[in-house]
């Protein structure tokens, strides 16, 4: 379909239902923004809880994206990490009925398709009852989804339970390059087992979706994406990176924020940007080691700390860095002063790091982040790990952190030069995917054709 043409009636009104979390809402919004910019007569109803509307309502967006809200029937975003299983259960059981009522109230025009996060377990069921096609958006890597869907292979190979330090290699999962057990989330063990059992219920609903969208670019994970053609009977499309790259070119007439002004004063490639994400956090003891190791490294840094900003500022007073509570991450990563990205390896951040051409220092915390770190370091070869030198250590010590930060930010070493060359190459691939005739735009048009022809 020519994007300049008006979309058919089957694709006039999209209802978007993201899973209520920052790492899920952002890519869903980026998808909707790309579509309304590409298809002039498309309208989107973007559904969030009342709490989330307070968080994102003021953010700029196209006029043809409108918010609708569900009541706050789930735990607050501010406390969901304290009982993650309870939060998932609340999303599964408390939001379906109010979403149905909202859906039935939308009639000008009536919804033509539902975009739902894969983790919104009831979306396919709701769409089926109303004969509205549902498109599933997977916001993590295609590789981790292939791992999840082939989890039975771990059991048959005797790898269901393992120690995080195990070196044994898994080489039998479609779409997954040979990977050590320690680089896989322990999905059958303890707390992770409980999380996986709840997630698996959502994966069982995938065959009922009209299609599956990935936030990645095909070129970044082609083996994993190709593996889905034999695993699923629905079409899959890689339409990423679903990051806000289009907004980088928007001119801002307001005064530049202080952190950008500070970056302008730093030498090229000298700043380590640090973000540990917006959901999980490390222990106080580990944070103390990070702070002291960073200070002793003598490296310039910009640290975004969502919560605990004042405490960090005090601990790092007199160092070569700046601590802020929020920043425009993609803009920071694309700034010439930034030479490295300390990341928790959430997939959105990983995609932004790749797009920016900045090497990544991987410090994963949980779940898909563990495998993302392996992909960054071993598959794409655009980063290093922060890890224990001794397997029995509970904490990564300040000395280890100091040394790896210095090594990572050394632009003159052969290792540093090769890592940065690879990061630049991967950036070109990522940017090429979203260029005018790139794979992601081609896939978006194919996806729209599929939806309109089968509706």
Curated annotation (Swiss-Prot):
The modification N-acetylmethionine is found at residue 1. Its EC number is 2.4.1.-. InterPro entries: UDP_glucos_trans (IPR002213). UDP-alpha-D-glucose binds at residues 278, 327-329, 344-352, 366-369. It comes from the Eukaryota. One of its GO terms (biological process) is regulation of flower development. This is UDP-glycosyltransferase 87A2. It comes from Arabidopsis thaliana. The gene is UGT87A2.
């Amino acid at each position: 379909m020519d994007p300049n043409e008006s979309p058919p009636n089957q694709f006039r009104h999209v209802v978007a239902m993201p899973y209520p979390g920052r790492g899920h809402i952002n890519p869903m919004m980026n998808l909707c923004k790309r579509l309304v910019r590409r298809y002039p007569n498309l309208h989107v109803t973007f559904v969030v809880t009342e709490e989330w509307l307070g968080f994102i309502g003021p953010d700029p967006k196209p006029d043809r994206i409108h918010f609708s809200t569900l009541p706050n029937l789930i735990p607050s975003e501010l406390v969901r990490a304290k009982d993650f299983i309870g939060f998932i259960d609340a999303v599964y059981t408390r939001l379906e009925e109010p979403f149905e009522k909202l859906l039935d109230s939308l009639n000008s025009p009536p919804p033509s398709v539902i975009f739902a996060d894969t983790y919104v377990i009831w979306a396919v069921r709701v769409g089926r009852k109303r004969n509205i096609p549902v498109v599933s958006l997977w916001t993590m890597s295609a590789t981790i989804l292939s791992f999840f869907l082939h989890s039975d292979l771990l059991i048959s190979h005797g790898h269901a339970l393992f120690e995080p330090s195990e070196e044994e290699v898994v080489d039998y999962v479609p779409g997954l390059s040979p990977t050590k057990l320690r680089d896989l989330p322990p999905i059958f063990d303890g707390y992770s087992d409980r999380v996986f059992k709840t997630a698996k219920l959502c994966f069982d609903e995938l065959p009922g979706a009209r299609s599956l969208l990935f936030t990645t670019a095909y070129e970044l994970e082609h083996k994993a994406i190709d593996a889905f053609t034999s695993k699923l009977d629905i079409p899959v499309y890689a339409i990423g990176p679903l990051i806000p790259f289009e907004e980088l070119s928007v001119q801002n007439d307001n005064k530049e924020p202080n952190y950008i002004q500070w970056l302008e004063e730093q030498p090229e490639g000298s700043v380590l940007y640090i973000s540990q994400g917006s959901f999980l956090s490390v222990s106080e003891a580990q944070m103390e080691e990070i702070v002291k190791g960073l200070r002793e490294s003598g490296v310039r840094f910009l640290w975004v700390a969502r919560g605990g900003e004042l405490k960090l500022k005090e601990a790092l007073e007199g160092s070569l860095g700046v601590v802020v509570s929020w920043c425009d991450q993609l803009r920071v990563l694309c700034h010439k002063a930034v030479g490295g990205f300390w990341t928790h390896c959430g997939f959105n951040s990983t995609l932004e790091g790749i797009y920016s051409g900045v090497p990544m220092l991987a410090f994963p915390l949980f779940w898909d982040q563990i495998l993302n770190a392996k992909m960054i370091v071993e598959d794409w070869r655009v980063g290093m790990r922060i890890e224990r030198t001794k397997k029995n250590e509970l904490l990564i010590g300040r000395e280890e952190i100091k040394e790896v930060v210095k090594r990572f930010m050394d632009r003159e070493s052969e290792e540093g030069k090769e890592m940065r060359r690879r990061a630049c190459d991967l950036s070109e691939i990522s940017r090429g995917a979203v260029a005018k005739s790139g794979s992601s735009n081609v896939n978006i048009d194919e996806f729209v054709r599929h939806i309109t022809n089968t509706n």
